[in-house]
Amino acid sequence: MEPRTPAEWKTLFESEAFARQTEYYGPLGVEYTPAGTHLRLWAPTAKQAAVNLYRRGTGGACVGTLPLQQQDKGVWSIYLPGDQHGKYYDFTLTTPFGTCNAADPYARSAGVNGVRSMIFDPARVDPQGWERDVRPVIPPARRSVWEVNVRDFSQDPASGVHTAWRGKFLAFTQQGTTLSSDGIHPTCLNYLKRLGVSYVQLMPIFDFGSVDESRPLTRQYNWGYDPTNFNVPEGSYSSDPTRGEVRVRECKQMIAALHAAGIGVVMDVVYNHMYRSDNVLNRAVPLYYFRQNADGSLSNGSGCGNEFASERPMARRYLIDSVLYWAREYHIDGFRFDLMGLYDVETMNLLRAELDKLPGGRDILMYGEPWQGGCSALHRYEANKNNLNMLNERIGIFCDNTRDAIKGGCFDAREPGYVEGRPGSFWDIGASVAAWCRSEKLPPHAPGQIISYVSAHDNFTLWDKLLMVRYARPEFAAVDKTALAQNRLAAGIYLTSMGLPFWQAGEEFARTKKGQGNSYRSSPALNRLDWHRAEQFHSLVDYYRGLIGLRAAFPRLGALDKASPAAIEFFPLEQPLVGWRLPAQWGDGAAWSALCVYYNPTETAQVVTLPGGSWKLLSDGISSSLWRGSSRICTGQTVLLPLSATVFGQV
């Protein structure tokens, strides 16, 4: 008997009988050859299915409608003879819920706004030389992640990027850009190469629904956490969203340019929900891909009206297929999972195992937000912070414990953290240094599971937070010396801590959003990187640059083994000072035999006694590049500057 209510459909979809009858692991989507194209769609609840063909990605009449043939396991298919490159299509499906048109869930490109899917020959679409693109080899000691939105990266008129490329994938390909083309102050890719970051994390680049690709972008803006087509690049980031091949080619050009600069690409993926409940997955198989409450209603742990049912077999397959597609086809170097707590542990571990099977796959990063956006109907083990020890040791999490310990809670603008003088927070600073491997609050397998950070796209920028803690009516555009020192101290803590360091683009030049804590659809002007600030705060940029280099020169800070956090020796200092020593690992090429690090969050100088031996001053609260020259050798007592992270190397 056919189900009649959402609750009955939930019972059916979660039954072993349905899984046996419909689990399918053959090809889906487009299988193109010049001689002909196979189309395959998994739609087990459909009663009829047809494909509609178009010459254009938007507008124009349908040039043919052909019935699909029903196969085993809920698959519908058709073979289209002849070269179909450049054709667009959608499906007309009749299910117990009615008749509708649907794009292909496995579409690899699309027309405007992702409504029509596209058939294309990858060999004719790939940029020149794509077959020679390779992922850069980035050892753990050099890993650091810089998070940016494609629009924000180059939207500033002073970015030096060609006007037509601003806010686009192609902005990442332009070489030698400088501030207002002055030939002096680097911007965009030129800036990243000088800064020394090893990975760029791109906020969502797959097709999202909150920006209308058919309209000018002047007043449109959204971060893109509202997916429409999971395997299709976003059209508004391309130079021509009407032609599906352009978004594919230009996305790959961006990735190739970053790889050529030695920078890996981390993709921010948002499989946990879709833009609307009426979406490509729900049209193909109504209700199947989305988690349901006991009464059959859609669970809303994402806070966006729906959440992906990763525990259902074909939904799990879809997620894994999609990630593997981006890894193989686009040479993606890492994946950041939005609201990872909405996925089950089993799915995440299976995905990690599948990535590991790819050539170089064990080096592909995988991490996510270990929380949810609301109450979820997921009743298996969630991939969240509480279950960290159930996840593969190479699946990491954003450590909000570290974030809040350093700068204060993110939900209360006035709540201070360690760098602003919060009493008692030094305990969590010590735990952060050891990537929480020596704390009972978190159960990581190894330090590599911890993302050490203080700012990301969510919540206040670090600069805004520092000013809002200190002042009732902050002047965000002002050059505040205390906030600058606190900013340097915050960076000095997480960039000398174990784990994977991560920061929001522009944190290193005091990025401000004028106190706006959730700018996901604010103006492009508020969100874009202000490249003038990179020049104005060049000394802060240089401080980050020096710490990145210092960290790479002492590989044990990026160690992935649990023995390394255990080797940290913490000093018994007067609160709130924190001090520690870490010996280098034999044979790792470290520039110094040990590091000795002190954090002083007070606004007065402090005197400490160094461990025995001779110590070279590598970094203090003003300069983090002393290690590059012949800085002074210290023994015995030394003075820590106010609001400073001070680093010594044993010689």
What residue spans do the PLM features occupy?
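C-terminal beta-strand-rich structural cap/linker in extracellular carbohydrate-active enzymes
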Residues: 43, 85-89, 630-651
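Solvent-exposed beta-strand/loop surfaces of large extracellular or lumenal domains
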Residues: 53-75, 618-634
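Carbohydrate-binding surface patches
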Residues: 31-47, 567-611
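The feature marks proteins involved in alpha-glucan
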Residues: 1-34, 38, 70-174
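Conserved alpha/beta catalytic core and glycan-binding cleft of carbohydrate-active enzymes
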Residues: 120, 352-353, 357-509, 516-520, ...
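Glycan-recognition and catalytic regions of carbohydrate-active enzymes
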Residues: 21-26, 493-516, 526-595
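Beta-strand-rich binding/interaction modules
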Residues: 41, 47-58, 62, 605-622
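Substrate-binding/active-site clefts of carbohydrate-active enzymes
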Residues: 151-330, 336-359, 365, 377
